[in-house]
């Protein structure tokens, strides 16, 4: 599988959360994460790599910048790794927020963890 195909799969999975926004990076945007999204107001910025590869120093820097801004971040080599990053990040963000929104986030995670 090509990296772009894996990223599309991840982006469309994020879009399936409902009330989600996703974008796949376009060429020429140096260092920007491959997949960007927002689920229930929680920003997601993740980088996809083929197995055996890792992000460039610039990509690591951008991921850290987004993390400091409060986004769910990480990098993955498989679809399953991407799912774990997003679901674990959503669960972490659910702590300390109002109960109604927390219930929505946890319900989404339960639905998509399968």
Per-segment meaning from a language model:
Residues 1-114:
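Catalytic phosphate/metal-binding cores of nucleic-acid and nucleotide-processing enzymes, i.e., regions
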């Amino acid at each position: 599988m090509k990296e772009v195909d894996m990223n599309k799969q991840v982006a469309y999975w994020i879009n399936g959360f409902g009330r989600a926004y996703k974008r796949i990076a376009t060429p020429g945007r140096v260092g920007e994460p491959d997949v960007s999204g927002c689920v229930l107001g929680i920003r997601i910025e993740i980088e996809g790599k083929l197995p055996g590869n890792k992000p460039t120093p610039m990509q690591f820097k951008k991921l850290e910048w987004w993390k400091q801004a409060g986004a769910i971040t990480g990098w993955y080599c498989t679809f399953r790794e991407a799912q774990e990053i997003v679901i674990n990040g959503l669960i972490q963000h659910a702590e300390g927020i109002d109960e109604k929104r927390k219930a929505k986030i946890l319900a989404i995670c339960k639905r998509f963890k399968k």
